[in-house]
Amino acid sequence: MIPKKIIIMAGGSGGHVFPGLTIARYLIEKGWLVNWIGTKNSIESRIIPTYGIKIHYISIKGLRNTSLKNLIISPIYILRAYYAVKKIIKTWSPDIVLGMGGYVSGPGGVASWNCNIPLLLHEQNKIAGITNKWLSRISTKNMQASPGVLRNAEVVGNPVCQSIIKVPNPINRFKNRTGLLRVLVIGGSQGSSILNRILPKVSFLLKEKIIFWHQTGNYELEKTKKKYNKLRLNQNLITSFIKNIASAYEWADLIICRSGALTVSEISIVGLGAIFIPYPHKDKQQHRNAEDLELIGAAKIIDQSNLNTKLIVNILNSLDRDKLFIMAKKAHSLGVRDAIFNIFNVINKISKKT
């Protein structure tokens, strides 16, 4: 039997890459051949090859907050990327092309449509990105994590890796847990400067109450470590990137983080109370992602413009492990744990028509 082939397009941020990687790994288990399209010097270039997946690099940049110069020359990059992906499609002949959103998906989405290859889209956020909005007009099938985001889209949830789904539920995690409150700090796959600046001060003021596991991102690891060391806070674990995020979720009583779609989905699946500091996008997509958890009392949302040391300290002082256990159970009630199966069913169904 000839194996099916798929090209997955995702890059720029963990929010696009990791859901795509979860889909890729599941498809490989099912006997599919997978190629990837991304950009050099982004997270996908460091992550995807380690899983034995062939990645093709295109030169393309996002247009959000870009300079006037880049905006003027962007059509040249888009055309080059389009022809590069078209050549890959002609050479490899995939059965399906899957776009996970973000600027990487744009040229490839148009190329797959032009080559009459079924184009599938997946939107992770509660507000669709520009690329997915445009491509949804020409795509074969649209998928979305939440209702009402893309036109004529099937609700499938956000795919997360099995290690996260297998994290023990809040009842088992919190049972007999004692000691300092365990706070996981994650500013997204690339870290967050504002969290790296504020959280060491918070740790100093609450060193008798909490312990941090802090993901800083690659660029600010040493600077953030120095802040903690200067305050003689040696009990905290400071790292640039947490590869085994499931173990971190299992360890934590609470998470302080951005509210990217994948992070919110993972927190719901695991069941973990959260303090969200949404990245201040103009469309407030991260704020929207977190609203359901705040509404049921599983999370608190702080706009970045209001964030300061005193506010975080006051919130943490108002919490104890019993309250965090209640927040965790509420979060757990919203978890969508069958997204990968839903997505595979859609992909498999479309592939049988080719």
Curated annotation (Swiss-Prot):
Predominantly, its location class is membrane
Q: Where does UDP-N-acetyl-alpha-D-glucosamine bind?
A: S13, G14, G15, N125, S189, I242, A261, L262, T263, V264, S265, E266, Q286
Q: Which UniProt keywords apply?
A: Cell cycle, Cell division, Cell inner membrane, Cell membrane, Cell shape, Cell wall biogenesis/degradation, Glycosyltransferase, Membrane, Peptidoglycan synthesis, Transferase
Give the pathway listed in the UniProt entry for this protein. Answer: Cell wall biogenesis; peptidoglycan biosynthesis
InterPro entries referenced in this protein's UniProt entry, alphabetically: GlcNAc_MurG, Glyco_trans_28_C, GlycoTrans_28_N
* Name of the molecule in the record: UDP-N-acetylglucosamine--N-acetylmuramyl-(pentapeptide) pyrophosphoryl-undecaprenol N-acetylglucosamine transferase
Report the function annotation for this chain: Cell wall formation. Catalyzes the transfer of a GlcNAc subunit on undecaprenyl-pyrophosphoryl-MurNAc-pentapeptide (lipid intermediate I) to form undecaprenyl-pyrophosphoryl-MurNAc-(pentapeptide)GlcNAc (lipid intermediate II).
According to the UniProt entry, what is the EC number of this protein? 2.4.1.227
Tell me the membrane topology, using the record's own terms.
Answer: Peripheral membrane protein
Q: Cross-referenced HAMAP family, in alphabetical order?
A: MurG (MF_00033)
**One biological process GO term for this chain?**
peptidoglycan biosynthetic process
Reaction catalysed? di-trans,octa-cis-undecaprenyl diphospho-N-acetyl-alpha-D-muramoyl-L-alanyl-D-glutamyl-meso-2,6-diaminopimeloyl-D-alanyl-D-alanine + UDP-N-acetyl-alpha-D-glucosamine = di-trans,octa-cis-undecaprenyl diphospho-[N-acetyl-alpha-D-glucosaminyl-(1->4)]-N-acetyl-alpha-D-muramoyl-L-alanyl-D-glutamyl-meso-2,6-diaminopimeloyl-D-alanyl-D-alanine + UDP + H(+)
PANTHER family noted in UniProt: GLYCOSYLTRANSFERASE (PTHR21015:SF22), UDP-N-ACETYLGLUCOSAMINE--N-ACETYLMURAMYL-(PENTAPEPTIDE) PYROPHOSPHORYL-UNDECAPRENOL N-ACETYLGLUCOSAMINE TRANSFERASE 1 (PTHR21015)
> What subcellular locations does the record give?
Cell inner membrane
Q: Which GO terms describe its cellular component?
A: plasma membrane
Can you name the source organism? Buchnera aphidicola subsp. Acyrthosiphon pisum (strain 5A)
